[in-house]
């Protein structure tokens, strides 16, 4: 493998054995591709905005005299960029402008004669845009639209599995689900009649819908049944015989023909009998008259003389009717062929319960069911039925629905109309009847071929269409009402309903969620999440066990591990690493094609539907060098089952061992050794890890760390290769390689880094450069690390030296004992940034004012404010400190005559305002790192706002000037090259100013042209700079668009540094979570023979019952990695020769059986080897991919190479006594995470505060400054101790004895420490509740 200069800085040793056939594709593509499809113009009009416009336009007036046509649309440029939107609290969006054409037709002239055409571009609201990282900025906060897994449109055949009816009879049903429109259900009842429901309303006999489609009884029977023909000859009945129909029946008479008795009466007819009948060619047999009695006729039989119907279709024959038929001269009688086995008389039976007789009565019946209480007219009934399933405006199966529909009915073509046809309905009924007859299978609803993904673009398009439909109604009204000659398209369209629909979706839909921004992994996982909840999906309460369960089709598409614990388990899933959606929205996963038992590198993506037809081998199947299967029998999956197949039967093979799991689970090393429940917790807890101040890459990783860090977008990645020309904490400048430059550009890339920004979870986002001046970089190299990344690898926690042993009860029940060294070295110190806002409004009594002049506040409290009343940057504040001074006008109070007199003499007093300043919340302390002031247009800016503005202008000018200088330097370097190659001496050039160079002339015409081009570029650059500066100035100085009634907003940002402390929650990556019980002095920690103490002591009892053995293997491998690092460190300290160093590191990389990674250090320069060694001295990072990790033997070899015992256990000594522990202890390095459940955020203590209104008891919870509930069990505890007075105090004055509380306060003030308990308020509540039940209880007081 070829490594770039940056990648050579630290290479992770990979234990993976299987070759990597397919690289992990961009992890956020599901979001970005979907949204791109939405806003990109699709010439076919199948997707996105184009599809929405085409489906609604043209809009015609009711009279048909005019219409509004859609021509095209374009999206404008967003006003603010992403960062500005976040600061200002606005939505990152672009204006949508649509070109519309209004056509007015001549009224009197023939149809289609155009009178006037007007074309105009109309504004249709704002469309939120997706940022480069797949998020949306809505009102200043980053949100993610989660993809939804919903039932695909199409037709589904299902059964109630015998749960509906008490008899346990299985009732089958079919449901036609459109993409939009009414649902159509067919279902059997326990009596085997077929019913239909529209939109889950009350059921009607299914034949009603056939009658509404203009089928007569005869046609219905003809469509659904085979016929049996009887002929009457001389009072004898002859039946046409199709022997196959007799199979399985019991003969009710002797079956004979040509004098041969084939089946005797009472005998069961078998296949042998049928073969005999067929062989002898028996076409007719004589049957007794009783045999035909009770059979239903196929058509109406009419007396030809009188024209009356003797026997109507579907009537059962009796002897009388038979006689009548014979008299009327009907010699040939056709009846329905039915039996109890596989030809049920369902439709025939249904017709008997059908109250309707013709089309009109059927339409009226459907109208009554859909619109109960409204009088039906023929026209209304026909319209309603037409619009239900046969109108393109109201009903759409969509391409997916039609494809699923046709596949289900086994049709050849998969494309077709979006509305239903007669054939569609009849074929669905036929298939349902076949299933009831025992032919065919019901569908599996949870199969991923029946559930599809609806992503951002599709949901936004649907919402946009909803808005357009609302507008359509208004436009129709206007086209019919207005004076069309003066109207323009602009006057027709009101953009409000459209932007309201879009805004509502992005702002408050259940699937538009506040982005989880704890760390890069939580961001990526949130964007790859798939939810079955949301509009048009399931609800938590209704979702049963089956929907939540892992299904065989989840393999490689949806992760079986990562899902939340709790009520949403199984409803919210995560996309697997390689999964993607196909054009229909179904999930597909890649496989390698197998041909004649040889695995090729050809990759096919298969959806769950396609996968069912193939035999697929596992990724860990043994292959020979030529890619053929080594074993004769191979473990494969086929049709959801796993079994052994011969090598010739295999069609495909998995691409990778980590194909099954999601990104989160693929980061857990030795996942294959963990119990699934714990792996689930591990995957979920990684997302809660807080980014630490000093990041530390995991010693034991899986090789996915780099992909996650880069794809999450928190790092700065080189767009093009080149050399680092300049680097500081806030910007990196790359001089682009000439071969990657566009013609005629300066060839400079500038990367501005993000510094100390608050994330959604109040963690700190900051980027740090990880390249040095003059270094070569290649495209895709990481230039700067973001939060939780280390040299471009994901680093969520810290490598800690841990020991598994009990330690004085401090690790009872998953607690952890942590060494003080961890605190001293700031290993788990995190920075949290809080945003506090102060809003100044215009009240009825006058405007609120932000000022330092606050009534009744001492000097000390104002010491941190400037003259505008806003806190300084850099001030250290604690709970209760004023951040922004604000006063609110008070209502006029009634004044006494004396006060009035004083007022009159001394003028206005400041007592008519009250203090409403922004203060630091209780329990929070930190440093002010930023202040922003937003002022409404037209309101005068205060001094502080002007200062901030001036500072921003200076900064913007400085940044732009520096950028210009960088670009200029690049340009002039190229101009100089051209001039020198054109024959001008370098010394002469250096004497001239750079601007004069452009005036020089060259003899060579080509060179002169180049020079002129560069001169043009220089002018353009300067002009561009002026334009940018002016735009920046305008943005900074313009007023802000604030909510109605708001004059000013001041935002103060506090940075809080949190060190680790007892009560904080920590976890490993294997679901091994715990709380810190004690921070122990270093000298008391257990230490090894070299005197090195451990950092954390974990309880060994936490491992066996939880079955997450992965943590033990990680500990051993971590120890080995550290051992190798220690050896490299020792060699560096002793200044060993580079050759020795190279040899040792090479040995470490080569270790392992048949590993895929090949690192050849001979291709590295000495300097590169030394730099690699410098980065490896703290431990050699190791990758052990999921299901393809390091074997026990390899771990032992690595331990041996590091000079450590292969048992992974060492002798420890007690730090307090110095005595050796009795047994050897497992010690090693485990990657530990600090989770975002910090004791500082949870802990609080109530003094006095608010009380609940009804019970008068203190509220609960930190947010309400509540108390702790003293519950039933706690009362028992005090009763057991006999602490009567303490108990009385708890239940009265400390809780809800209102009078007792006030008395006690008075007593304490008077210095009298007595308490008089009274009546608890909850007793009165109890009395009232009992009274509400009609029992009067009165309290008699002595």
Curated annotation (Swiss-Prot):
Gene3D superfamilies: 2.40.50.100, 2.40.50.150, 3.90.1100.10, DNA-directed RNA polymerase, beta subunit, external 1 domain, DNA-directed RNA polymerase, subunit 2, domain 6, RNA polymerase alpha subunit dimerisation domain, RNA polymerase Rpb2, domain 2. InterPro entries: DNA-dir_RNA_pol_bsu_ext_1_sf (IPR042107), DNA-dir_RNA_pol_bsu_external_1 (IPR019462), DNA-dir_RNA_pol_su2 (IPR015712), DNA-dir_RNAP_su2_dom (IPR007120), DNA-dir_RNAP_su2_hyb_sf (IPR037033), RNA_pol_bsu_bac (IPR010243), RNA_pol_bsu_CS (IPR007121), RNA_pol_bsu_protrusion (IPR007644). GO terms for biological process: DNA-templated transcription. The keyword Endoplasmic reticulum does not apply. The keyword Nucleotidyltransferase applies. It is an enzyme of class 2 (transferase). Keywords: DNA-directed RNA polymerase, Nucleotidyltransferase, Transcription, Transferase. It holds the Pfam family RNA_pol_Rpb2_3. It catalyses: RNA(n) + a ribonucleoside 5'-triphosphate = RNA(n+1) + diphosphate. The RNAP catalytic core consists of 2 alpha, 1 beta, 1 beta' and 1 omega subunit. When a sigma factor is associated with the core the holoenzyme is formed, which can initiate transcription. Belongs to the RNA polymerase beta chain family. DNA-dependent RNA polymerase catalyzes the transcription of DNA into RNA using the four ribonucleoside triphosphates as substrates. PANTHER family: DNA-DIRECTED RNA POLYMERASE I SUBUNIT 2. This is DNA-directed RNA polymerase subunit beta. The gene is rpoB.
């Amino acid at each position: 493998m070829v490594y770039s200069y940056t990648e050579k800085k630290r290479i992770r040793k990979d234990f993976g054995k299987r070759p990597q056939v397919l690289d992990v594709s961009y992890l956020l593509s599901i979001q970005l591709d979907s949204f791109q499809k939405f806003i990109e113009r699709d010439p076919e009009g199948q997707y996105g905005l184009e599809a929405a416009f085409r489906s609604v336009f043209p809009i015609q007036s009711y009279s048909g005299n005019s219409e509004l046509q859609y021509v095209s649309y374009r999206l404008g440029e967003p006003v603010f960029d992403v960062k500005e939107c976040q600061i200002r609290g606005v939505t990152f969006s672009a204006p949508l402008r649509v070109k519309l054409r209004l056509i007015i037709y001549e009224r009197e002239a023939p149809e289609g004669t155009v009178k006037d055409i007007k074309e105009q571009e109309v504004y249709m609201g704002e469309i939120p845009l997706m940022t480069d990282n797949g998020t949306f900025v809505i009102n200043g906060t980053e949100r993610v639209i989660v993809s939804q897994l919903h039932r695909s449109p199409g037709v589904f055949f299902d059964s109630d599995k015998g749960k509906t009816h008490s008899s346990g009879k299985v009732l089958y049903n079919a449901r036609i689900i459109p993409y939009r429109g009414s649902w159509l259900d067919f279902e059997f009842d326990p009596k085997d009649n077929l019913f239909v429901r529209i939109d889950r309303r009350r059921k009607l006999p299914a034949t009603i819908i056939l009658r509404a489609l203009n089928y007569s009884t005869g046609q219905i029977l003809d469509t659904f049944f085979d016929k049996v023909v009887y002929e009457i000859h001389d009072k004898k009945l002859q039946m046409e015989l199709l022997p196959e129909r007799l199979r399985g029946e019991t003969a009710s008479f002797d079956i004979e023909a040509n004098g041969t008795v084939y089946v005797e009466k009472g005998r069961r007819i078998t296949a042998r009998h049928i073969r005999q009948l067929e062989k002898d060619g028996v076409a007719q047999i004589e049957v007794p008259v009783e045999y035909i009695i009770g059979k239903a006729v196929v058509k109406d039989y009419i007396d030809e003389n009188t024209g009356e119907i003797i026997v109507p279709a579907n009537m059962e024959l009796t002897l009388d009717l038979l006689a009548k038929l014979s008299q009327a001269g009907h010699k040939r009688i056709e009846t329905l062929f039915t039996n109890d086995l596989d030809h049920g008389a369902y439709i025939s039976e249904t017709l008997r319960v059908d109250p309707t007789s013709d089309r009109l009565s059927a339409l009226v019946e459907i109208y009554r069911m859909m619109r109960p209480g409204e009088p039906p007219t023929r026209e209304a009934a026909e319209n309603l039925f037409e619009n239900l399933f046969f109108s393109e405006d109201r009903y759409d199966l969509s391409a997916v629905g039609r494809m699923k529909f046709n596949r289900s009915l086994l049709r050849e073509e998969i494309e077709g109309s979006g509305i239903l046809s007669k054939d569609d309905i009849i074929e669905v009924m036929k298939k349902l009847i076949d299933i009831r007859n025992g032919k065919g299978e019901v569908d599996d609803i949870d199969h991923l071929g029946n559930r599809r993904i609806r992503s951002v673009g599709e949901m936004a398009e649907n919402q946009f269409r909803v808005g357009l439909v609302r507008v359509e109604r208004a436009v129709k009204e206007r086209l019919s009402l207005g004076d069309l000659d003066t109207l323009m398209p602009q006057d027709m369209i009101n953009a409000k309903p459209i932007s309201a629909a879009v805004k509502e979706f992005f702002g408050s839909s259940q699937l538009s969620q506040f982005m989880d921004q704890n760390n890069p992994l939580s961001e990526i996982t949130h964007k790859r999440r798939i939810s079955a909840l949301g509009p048009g999906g399931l609800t938590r309460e209704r979702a049963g066990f089956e929907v939540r369960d892992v299904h065989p089709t989840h393999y490689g598409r949806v992760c079986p591990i990562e899902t939340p614990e709790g009520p949403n388990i199984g409803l919210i899933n995560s996309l697997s690493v390689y999964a993607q959606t196909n054009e229909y929205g179904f999930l597909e996963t890649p496989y390698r094609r197998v041909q004649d038992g040889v695995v090729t590198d050809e990759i096919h993506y298969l959806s769950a539907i396609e996968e069912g037809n193939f035999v697929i081998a596992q990724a860990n199947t043994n292959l020979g060098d030529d890619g053929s299967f080594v074993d004769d029998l191979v473990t494969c999956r086929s049709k959801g089952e796993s079994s052994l197949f011969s090598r010739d039967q295999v069609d495909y093979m998995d691409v990778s061992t980590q194909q099954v799991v999601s990104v989160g689970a693929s980061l857990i090393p030795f996942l294959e050794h963990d119990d699934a429940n714990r792996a689930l917790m591990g995957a979920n807890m990684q997302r809660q890890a807080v980014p630490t101040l000093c990041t530390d890459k995991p010693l034991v990783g899986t090789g996915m760390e780099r992909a996650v860090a880069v794809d999450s977008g928190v790092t700065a990645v080189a767009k093009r290769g080149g050399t680092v020309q300049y680097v500081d904490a806030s910007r990196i400048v790359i001089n682009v390689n000439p071969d990657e430059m566009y013609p005629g550009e300066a060839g400079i890339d500038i990367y501005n880094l993000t510094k100390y920004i608050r994330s959604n979870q109040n963690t700190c986002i900051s980027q740090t450069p990880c390249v040095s001046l003059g270094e070569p970089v290649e495209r895709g190299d990481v230039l700067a690390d973001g939060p939780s990344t280390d040299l471009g690898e994901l680093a969520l926690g810290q490598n800690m030296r841990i020991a598994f042993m009990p330690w004085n009860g401090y690790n009872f029940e998953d607690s952890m004992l942590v060494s003080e060294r961890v605190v001293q070295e700031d290993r788990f110190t995190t920075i949290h940034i809080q945003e506090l806002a102060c809003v100044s409004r215009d009240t009825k009594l006058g405007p609120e004012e932000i000022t330092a002049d606050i009534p009744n506040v001492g000097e000390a409290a104002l010491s941190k404010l400037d003259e505008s009343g806003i806190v300084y940057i850099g001030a250290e504040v604690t709970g209760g400190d004023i951040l922004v001074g604000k006063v609110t006008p008070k209502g006029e109070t009634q004044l006494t005559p004396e006060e009035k007199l004083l007022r009159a003499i001394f003028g206005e007093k400041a007592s008519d305002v009250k203090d409403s300043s922004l203060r630091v919340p209780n329990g929070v302390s930190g440093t002010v790192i930023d202040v922003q002031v937003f002022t409404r247009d037209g309101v005068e800016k205060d001094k502080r706002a002007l200062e901030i503005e001036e500072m921003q202008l200076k900064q913007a000018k400085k940044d732009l000037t520096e950028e210009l200088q960088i670009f200029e330097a690049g340009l002039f370097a190229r101009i100089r090259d051209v001039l020198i190659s054109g024959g001008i001496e370098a010394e002469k050039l250096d004497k001239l100013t750079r601007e004069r160079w452009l005036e020089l002339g060259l003899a060579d015409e080509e060179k002169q042209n180049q020079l002129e081009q560069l001169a043009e570029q220089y002018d353009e650059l300067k002009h561009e700079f002026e334009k940018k500066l002016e735009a920046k100035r305008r943005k900074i100085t313009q007023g802000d668009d604030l909510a109605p009634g708001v004059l000013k907003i001041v935002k103060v940002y506090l940075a809080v540094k949190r060190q680790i402390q007892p009560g904080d929650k920590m976890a490993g990556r294997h679901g091994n979570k715990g709380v810190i019980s004690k921070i122990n002095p270093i000298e008391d920690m257990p230490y090894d023979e070299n005197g090195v103490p451990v950092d954390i002591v974990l309880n060994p009892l936490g491992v066996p019952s939880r079955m997450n053995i992965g943590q033990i293997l990680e500990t051993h491998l971590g120890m080995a990695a550290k051992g190798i690092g220690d050896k490299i460190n020792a060699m560096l300290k002793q200044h060993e020769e580079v050759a020795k160093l190279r040899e040792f590191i090479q040995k470490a990389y080569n270790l392992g059986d048949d590993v895929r990674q090949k690192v050849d250090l001979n291709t590295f320069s000495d300097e590169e080897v030394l730099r690699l060694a410098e980065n490896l001295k703290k431990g050699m990072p190791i990758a052990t991919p999921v299901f393809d990790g390091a074997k026990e033997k390899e771990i032992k070899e690595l331990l041996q190479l590091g000079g450590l015992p292969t048992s992974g256990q060492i002798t420890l000594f007690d730090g307090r006594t110095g005595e050796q522990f009795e047994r050897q202890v497992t010690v090693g390095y485990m990657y530990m995470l600090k989770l975002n459940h910090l004791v500082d955020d949870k802990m609080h203590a109530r003094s006095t505060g608010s009380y609940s209104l009804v019970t008068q008891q203190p509220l609960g919870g930190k947010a309400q400054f509540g108390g702790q509930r003293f519950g039933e069990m706690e009362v028992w505890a005090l009763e057991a101790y006999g602490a009567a007075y303490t108990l009385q105090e708890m239940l009265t004055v400390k809780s809800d004895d209102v009078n007792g509380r006030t008395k006690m306060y008075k007593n304490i003030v008077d210095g009298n420490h007595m308490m008089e308990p009274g009546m608890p308020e909850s007793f009165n509540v109890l009395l009232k509740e009992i009274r509400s039940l009609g029992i009067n209880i009165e309290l008699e007081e002595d």
